[in-house]
Amino acid sequence: LIKRKSTFFLVIYLISLIIISGCNKPPEQDIGEAVSKTEDYFKKSKGIDCVGAFDDDTVKFRLLLEEQPTVEEATKIYNDVLKTIEKYSNNEKTWDYYNVKLDIGYKNNIIFKGTKDVGEKLIVKSK
């Protein structure tokens, strides 16, 4: 009887461990490649000079604009960047696993910063 209980609890423990570790693992994707493709997309189709990078769990993306945007325009551009990276990563839950730091430069100055932490909404601030 004790041996059966021990075996039962061991099996339950192992199943729980597998389920928990499977749920917390980021999806298999190359986020660095998605960032690179997004960079190319904005340069070629939108004519926006930009640079992107991926470091551990944070995507960093800088856009250099020729005209100064409003806060609303900056927010729209940032959302376009997020959607494009998500599209190229082939995972609609990308932002449940990665943080994002964005900024917009105009005339050699950073004028807007955007941050989006895992599972949170995008926050845009003027500098």
What are these regions (language model features)?
Residues 85-89:
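Short catalytic/binding micro-motifs of nucleotide second-messenger systems
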Residues 32-46, 55, 62-72, 92-127:
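Polar/charged, Gly/Pro-rich intrinsically disordered segments
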Residues 24-29:
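Transmembrane signal-anchor/signal-peptide helices with a preference for the extracytoplasmic
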